[in-house]
Amino acid sequence: MPISPAALAQLPVRRLGPADLLACADLSENRGWLREEHKWELLLTAGTGYGIDDPEGEGLLACSVVTSYGPGLAAIGMVLVAERYARRGVGRRLMRYVLEETGETPLTLYATANGQPLYEGLGFTEIARAEMVKGRFSFSAPAPDVTVRPATAEDLQDVLRLDREIFGLDRTPLITRLPAFADHLRVAVDGGVITGFAAAWPNMDTHVIGPLIARDTATAQALVASLAEASDRPLRTDIELRHTALLGWLKENGLNTIITNAVMVRSIPDLPGDADRRFAPLTVAAG
């Protein structure tokens, strides 16, 4: 017998941790998403997960993850509700709980067309749109002549400084995990100065490129090309529509649009940092 609306509204929300990884991946699969266990492990370790257990004992009924960057910003991602409980107000209730937990902290998230009305009703506004593109990199359009090399441990402090400048906030807990999380990590260098960096991390049968931080489009293109040379998988990344030259170049090189999402914020007029040099997020779930 289906659980009543009153009983559903009383189910407790609890914190999720690394031990809930498989349950989160199962919920992703239930909604037609990829399991993405590698990404889930990062998010549940570096962020704070919230979930509602299914009273029928079938794992999680709903979940979400918050990645905090201090009092200046937190990102909400992976908001999922099991198919059997869809359209019953569970997603809105979980989001309201997360909003209470985050208090006055400004928030950001990427929203699908289906999810955007829910978030607008909770006070989020759209500030940009981003295309997810995916495909085998063809090397049809050449990359600019920019020096790119594998990152080393000695680069870490310079990478953190550049990321803090461009992202606008300190995300050391995430960036310091990149060497272990990513299969490939590259830096662009000009005159001994690091001018950009990018990672390619494994996600099912693809390599996701992110973060992609660079002083200009040419540097971003060179970083992507270097990662593509190192990869034996299709590539996937999320690029804001403002970066028309980079998007056009990626499409010339065989990556096609999969979906367009809204970049949204709450309690802040825009994201901190420099959007012109912030080309791709580490993952849309972490902003």
Spans of model-derived segments:
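Hydrophobic, ordered structural segments
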Residues: 86, 108-110, 116, 120
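Surface-exposed beta-loop interaction hotspot
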Residues: 127-157, 161-163
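Intrinsically disordered, low-complexity, positively biased terminal segments
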Residues: 1-7, 17-18, 22, 42, ...
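A structural microfeature
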Residues: 61-62, 128, 196, 259
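Conserved catalytic-core motifs of GNAT/GCN5-like acyltransferases
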Residues: 104-110, 125-139, 257-269
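Active-site-proximal cofactor/substrate-binding loop regions of enzyme domains
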Residues: 10-104, 111
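Conserved active-site tyrosine of GNAT-family acetyltransferases
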Residues: 119-124, 250
